[in-house]
């Protein structure tokens, strides 16, 4: 498929979404232009529409209104839920090699290459269900790299991982963003990581989105939240 030339990886225009015609809208008239090579963190409260936005970008859902245009050829993803892998006695290598065959990639060496890239080549003979949360995330990132993606989409990457593991994961992801020039879209609940690693932050609140850079996010949203928290505390003390 021929991809039109564009400075953007993904372009959302006036995108709204609801599951049925009589249901409430989860996303409301979202406009979002994601430049190629960007590292975009999607943040917001639970239920604000973050995972829905990711599913729309991955074409797992269709927008109720508006359009989503992709200007990249290959998309990799790391899902939030990975439990299905834990029920099968596969080694790390077997799991990734199965995915390589699914993508019809002929070169077997790519499995070792992506494991090396994420620092997990020494674990290729380990059973997947024996891995720690951080190790499993690295394996799934390696899996997403097998198809040499132009766009990498991740949903709550740091969930269930200790602070040291999170630090390793974010360093890896930032390195991939730089070395491969891969565009990253990451649903994020770790605000410190979003502010530190992102080139852009997309803040969702009740289905409405606002795009800003990390510095703007700190001044416009975090400071506002601190002021609200202080006001609430003062009310309770009266």
UniProtKB/Swiss-Prot annotation:
The answer, when asked if DNA-binding is one of the entry's keywords, is: no
UniProt key word Cell membrane: yes
* Protein name per UniProt: Probable metal transport system ATP-binding protein TP_0035
Q: Where is it mostly found?
A: membrane
Q: From the Swiss-Prot or TrEMBL record, what is one GO molecular function term?
A: ATP hydrolysis activity
Q: Where in the cell is it found?
A: Cell inner membrane
Keywords, ordered alphabetically: ATP-binding, Cell inner membrane, Cell membrane, Membrane, Nucleotide-binding, Transport
How does the record say this protein sits in the membrane? Answer: Peripheral membrane protein
Q: List the InterPro entries hit by this protein, alphabetically.
A: AAA+_ATPase (IPR003593), ABC_transporter-like_ATP-bd (IPR003439), Metal_Ion_Import_ABC (IPR050153), P-loop_NTPase (IPR027417)
GO cellular component terms, A-Z: plasma membrane
- What residues does the ABC transporter domain cover? 10-231
Q: What does this protein do?
A: Part of an ATP-driven transport system TP_0034/TP_0035/TP_0036 for a metal. Probably responsible for energy coupling to the transport system.
What the record says about family reads: Belongs to the ABC transporter superfamily.
Which residues of the sequence carry a binding annotation for ATP? 44-51
């Amino acid at each position: 498929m021929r991809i039109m030339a564009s400075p953007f990886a993904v372009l959302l225009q006036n995108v709204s979404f609801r599951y049925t015609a009589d249901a409430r809208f989860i996303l409301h008239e979202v406009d979002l232009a994601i430049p190629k090579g960007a590292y975009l963190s999607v943040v917001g409260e639970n239920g604000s529409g973050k995972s829905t936005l990711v599913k729309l970008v991955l074409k797992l859902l269709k927008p109720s209104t508006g359009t989503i245009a992709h200007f990249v050829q290959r998309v990799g993803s790391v899902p939030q839920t990975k439990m299905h892998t834990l029920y099968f006695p596969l080694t790390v290598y077997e799991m990734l090699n199965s995915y390589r065959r699914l993508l019809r990639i002929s070169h077997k060496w790519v499995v070792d290459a992506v494991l090396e890239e994420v620092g997990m080549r020494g674990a290729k003979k380990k059973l997947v269900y024996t891995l720690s949360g951080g190790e499993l995330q690295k394996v799934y990132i390696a899996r997403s790299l097998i198809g040499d993606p132009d766009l990498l989409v991740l949903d709550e990457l740091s969930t269930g991982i200790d602070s040291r593991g999170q630090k390793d994961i974010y360093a890896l992801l930032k390195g991939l963003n730089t070395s491969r020039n891969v565009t990253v879209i990451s649903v994020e609940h770790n605000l410190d990581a979003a502010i530190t690693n992102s080139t852009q932050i997309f803040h969702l609140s009740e289905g409405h989105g606002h795009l800003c850079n990390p510095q703007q996010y700190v001044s416009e949203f975090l400071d506002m939240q601190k002021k609200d928290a202080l006001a609430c505390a003062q009310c309770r003390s009266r």
